[in-house]
Curated annotation (Swiss-Prot):
Name the record gives this protein: Alpha-1,3-galactosidase B
Keyword Cell membrane: yes
Function: Alpha-galactosidase. Removes both branched alpha-1,3-linked galactose residues of blood group B antigens and linear alpha-1,3-linked galactose structures.
Subcellular location: Cell membrane
Gene behind this protein: glaB1
Record flagged with keyword Transferase: no
GO molecular function, one term: alpha-galactosidase activity
Lineage: Bacteria, Pseudomonadati, Bacteroidota, Bacteroidia, Bacteroidales
Lipidation positions, renumbered (N-palmitoyl cysteine): 15
Domain of life: Bacteria
Catalytic activity: Hydrolysis of terminal, non-reducing branched (1->3)-alpha-D-galactosidic residues, producing free D-galactose; Hydrolysis of terminal, non-reducing linear (1->3)-alpha-D-galactosidic residues, producing free D-galactose; Hydrolysis of terminal, non-reducing alpha-D-galactose residues in alpha-D-galactosides, including galactose oligosaccharides, galactomannans and galactolipids
Amino acid sequence: MKLLSVLSLSLVLSCTTLSAQKVYEISAFGLKANSSKNASPVLQKALAKIKAEYKEGEKVILRFPEGRYEFHEKGAAVREYYISNHDQTNPKKVGIALEDMKNLTLDGQGSEFVFHGRMLPVSLLRSENCLLKNFSIDFENPHIAQVKIVENDPQDGIVFEPAPWVDYRIAKDSIFEAYGEGWTMRHSWGIAFDGDTKHLVYNTSDIGCPTKGASEVAPRRIHAPGWKDARLVPGTVVAMRGWGRPTPGIFLSHDVNTTIENVKVHYAEGMGLLAQLCENITLEKFGVCLKGDADPRYFTTQADATHFSGCKGKIVSCNGLYEGMMDDAINVHGTYLKVVKRVDDRTLVGRYMHGQSWGFEWGCPGDEVQFIRSNTMELVGKQNKIISIRPYDKEQTEGAREFLITFQEPVDQVINEQSGFGIENLTWTPEVLFSGNVIRNNRARGSLFSTPRKTIVENNLFDHTSGAAILLCGDCNGWFETGACRHVIIRKNRFVNALTNLFQFTNAVISIYPEIPDLKGQQQYFHGGPEGGIVIEDNEFETFDAPILYAKSVDGLVFRNNTIKLNTEYKPFHPNRNRFWLERVTNVTIAE
């Protein structure tokens, strides 16, 4: 009887466990893998059913049989999203709009999600304990046009060959333009890749791509007589691009405890992943990458691979592959509001200043804040707390640029609209672990961190990042991206031939470069402090050039037990000829 009771109890527990998990097969909604059927309206229907049937505490799985799925603008979810560090153009067409979900797993089982036109592939908003895994995101016809240089004559210009998937035409005004489903692009700039190695071409940075006067001299061969650049030898591959970034591949907002596992973004017209105002994000084997060594493409995303704006908790990014993107592999920061009005001793109006970062929530009652003088990047007054906050220039937060904020304690009298101050939200700042990743063959920088909480960067390979491999920034003047780094550990990484090109803030392989207009007038230090400062140890640098470390306005900097190996793979060219260049840095230890 006792054994029977145990068995009965086990059966009850098993059934309870099973009943608390509900599986939805996308095929049950009439969507089959490897068909030409538009998946967008099917996903709308499936997600509506999941939300309608959800019971509190239930775990839900939405599963795709392995294969290829096509998503088009027609029938997609239409949303007004304001996305940090992107163009604030609305509405947006969303292929998979996951909103107000709990305990949801979306399992692609190795599927390819292919998008057409101009879409936001996946969004996850206001959700808790969700897992996205085992799928890839790509576009059938990317907005970046990949071309190969066929001929280069100093007097006669360049002949180039668009990649087979590029749809193009010569417009009436004789300019080369690419086009696709609902879009047309004229590419003003480009990034040059070595045709054999896929490294960015040495000392080219952003190149102009003037195609005025273009003509087709043979099938899929375009002569651009005004495009003259001796660095682009035949065989060079150019990713022709613009500066727009309408949507990321994956958009996360107001989520708690999100995990993304074994997901690959092969192309997005903005960033690979953008997360804002989220708490606790884990990326495991996430990639913004090509489809293997045989992939004929050289590029991935139009901007950063991953970007975290105004998040808190812990950001964990491990064992990922980031390559071919047009900006950083990871960027972690908050956003300064500029003080544009002092209403009374406890009330200020703060404004989003950058043209690609506005329209979304900035803070909540109870959040801790501090104030920074823009020209010297020094803290003024004491930390304070938000009592109330509401949009000032609009009735609702969505689309707002300005906020009326009342604080718990009186605000220092010097902080007003004339004196140039920013407000930093300290509550929405994350701890970061960036470990075991490969970053290679990308434009600009390898990684960028601007958070006061503990940041560990370890066991990564930075391979031909073209600009600085690691940047610690902070800027209340241009990008308005917070903030100071108080405790950073950079250890056991390998850096291979970074700085083959020059980009913003790239003074050395590791560049600690806050934007400080009046450095001479600064009395405090921006980065570092009693929390632990910045420690760079047990790393290996393989380089052809001089600059290894640049630091500005740091209190507490340690560089020890690192190995520097010189090679002759490129000719030294960087204007910074110093191995270590320190400006206003104190409490320093340098021991190679």
